[in-house]
């Protein structure tokens, strides 16, 4: 099984446990707790090595995860999930599991993630209007991340999954160029 398949399997299991209505913890809270743990793991090479090394006994790893969970005030559900990762030697895959978990929860809760590139910084009213248009196109609530790409000349490009909505001047010029070259 590939690493991404493994990450998806663990992420699905966590999503099942923290789904709205079936858990005392909200999915967003679980995600934040896991991010906090991931940040602690990334901040210390020694900690990362201790939790990922096969030579460190699982009992010690669990004790370390327990202490960090106490310090970060991590809920029992997320703590138990971290214990499962330690027990199955998957703690090194936490970043990929987190990414999969975010995508799974977005899908289950009716959200879509959009990467928006524009020629200049968009104003708040422009962002709101763009969000409303994308929500109407996709039928989902939109979570947007913005970037400026001056090469677009003007307009914007939105990427949602594998779908690209190109409203840039550069894209229009490229389309015009293709049409003109095929008409020759």
From Swiss-Prot:
Gene Ontology CC, one term: plasma membrane
UniProt GO molecular function: proton-transporting ATP synthase activity, rotational mechanism
Main location: membrane
Key words of the record: ATP synthesis, Cell inner membrane, Cell membrane, CF(1), Hydrogen ion transport, Ion transport, Membrane, Transport
Family statement: Belongs to the ATPase delta chain family.
InterPro entries according to UniProt: ATP_synth_OSCP/delta_N_sf, ATPase_OSCP/dsu
Protein's job: F(1)F(0) ATP synthase produces ATP from ADP in the presence of a proton or sodium gradient. F-type ATPases consist of two structural domains, F(1) containing the extramembraneous catalytic core and F(0) containing the membrane proton channel, linked together by a central stalk and a peripheral stalk. During catalysis, ATP synthesis in the catalytic domain of F(1) is coupled via a rotary mechanism of the central stalk subunits to proton translocation.
Topology relative to the membrane: Peripheral membrane protein
Protein location: Cell inner membrane
Subunit-level organization: F-type ATPases have 2 components, F(1) - the catalytic core - and F(0) - the membrane proton channel. F(1) has five subunits: alpha(3), beta(3), gamma(1), delta(1), epsilon(1). F(0) has three main subunits: a(1), b(2) and c(10-14). The alpha and beta chains form an alternating ring which encloses part of the gamma chain. F(1) is attached to F(0) by a central stalk formed by the gamma and epsilon chains, while a peripheral stalk is formed by the delta and b chains.
Name of the molecule in the record: ATP synthase subunit delta
Pfam families: OSCP
Native species: Solibacter usitatus (strain Ellin6076)
Domain of life of the native organism: Bacteria
């Amino acid at each position: 099984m590939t690493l991404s398949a493994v990450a998806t399997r663990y992420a699905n299991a966590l999503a099942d446990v923290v789904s709205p209505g079936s858990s005392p913890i909200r999915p967003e809270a679980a995600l934040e707790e896991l991010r906090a743990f991931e940040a602690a793991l990334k901040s210390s090479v020694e900690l990362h090595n201790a939790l990922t090394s096969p030579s460190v006994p699982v009992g010690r790893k669990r004790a370390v995860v327990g202490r960090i969970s106490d310090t970060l005030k991590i809920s029992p559900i997320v703590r138990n999930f971290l214990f499962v990762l330690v027990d199955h030697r998957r703690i090194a895959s936490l970043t990929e599991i987190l990414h999969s978990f975010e995508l799974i929860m977005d899908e289950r809760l009716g959200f879509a993630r959009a990467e928006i590139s524009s020629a200049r910084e968009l104003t708040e009213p422009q962002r709101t209007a763009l969000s409303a248009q994308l929500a109407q196109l996709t039928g989902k609530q939109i979570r947007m991340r913005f970037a400026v790409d001056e090469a677009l000349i003007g307009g914007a490009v939105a990427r949602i999954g594998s779908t690209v909505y190109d409203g840039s001047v550069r894209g229009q010029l490229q389309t015009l160029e293709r049409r003109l070259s095929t008409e020759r």
